[in-house]
């Protein structure tokens, strides 16, 4: 039987963003979670839950998603070295502690730790960093302040009020999970009493409220690679929120936001700028200087240059993070009309205008076509 399209499984279009995919998965996971579907409909919900989990695992991974978009299910076939493959109830139980574990009695993030206490991966953090075009092109090293969680100095990480002890959970007997029977099957779920920790704190620490950790801030060195573009993300492994019960910490994602530049606009590896020239230079030609990220460059303006003319400077753009060569710089010509003319200047321009008209020659590439259109319009 052919597998259902992963995008159809989650109910999202093929151009869906990572956030849209995550939201769709959360919605389906909560709808079909075993805790909410028991009895006759449990098997159907179980299958839908597993389908949603498999689709999310594929589409939330950039490399797997790219392979799937290009080759379909064959690109992520486990027999070819990728994909999730078929799962027994071990993988199904593992999914219980996924990204929505907090909804069903766990912590953020998640994995499941065998037959012992539930362990959960910490949540990911995001940080928006603004960089200038010059910094994006050349790369930079920066320091950022991010939240960190350290052992509470009062209870030393136990979560219990000094002088009191942590008790073993009487519901799961310290395992962090309880067994739930569904027909012939037995499925593990997070203990609702201790939320998977396997322990209870009768007298929580007043400083950390029983968490065992306090929130602080730390300075992190970040290397911005040369050529990075707006919207790209840098992953800092292990600098997210802490895990629970010995689980690994989450990651920090630094999202790059490119500041608006006074001169250039970026389009991939190419740069664009508007270059104003006088109408005398446009008519007679000449050499002008144009700005580049590396300094000044010269452009020869041929006589008769029209507004909107585009000049290309090869290799004067940006070398992207995945590019072998830098892009180009495109200079778009605008012709400026002089203002605040003196009487003498006005007289000279009028003489020039009359001289051109008397000559009878067409001095604009669009003039002949425009004149013919006017004659046809007025029936001349």
Curated annotation (Swiss-Prot):
This protein's UniProt keywords: Chaperone, Cytoplasm, DNA replication, Metal-binding, Repeat, Stress response, Zinc, Zinc-finger
Cleaved signal peptide residues: none
Stretches with biased composition (Basic residues): 24-34
Protein residues bound to Zn(2+) 2: 169, 172, 191, 194
Subcellular location: Cytoplasm
ZnF segments: CR-type: 139-217
Positions of CXXCXGXG motif repeats: 152-159, 169-176, 191-198, 205-212
InterPro entries in the cross-refs: DnaJ, DnaJ_C, DnaJ_domain, DnaJ_domain_CS, HSP40/DnaJ_pept-bd, HSP_DnaJ_Cys-rich_dom, HSP_DnaJ_Cys-rich_dom_sf, J_dom_sf
NCBIfam families: DnaJ_bact, PRK10767.1
Function text: Participates actively in the response to hyperosmotic and heat shock by preventing the aggregation of stress-denatured proteins and by disaggregating proteins, also in an autonomous, DnaK-independent fashion. Unfolded proteins bind initially to DnaJ; upon interaction with the DnaJ-bound protein, DnaK hydrolyzes its bound ATP, resulting in the formation of a stable complex. GrpE releases ADP from DnaK; ATP binding to DnaK triggers the release of the substrate protein, thus completing the reaction cycle.
Protein name as it appears in the record: Chaperone protein DnaJ
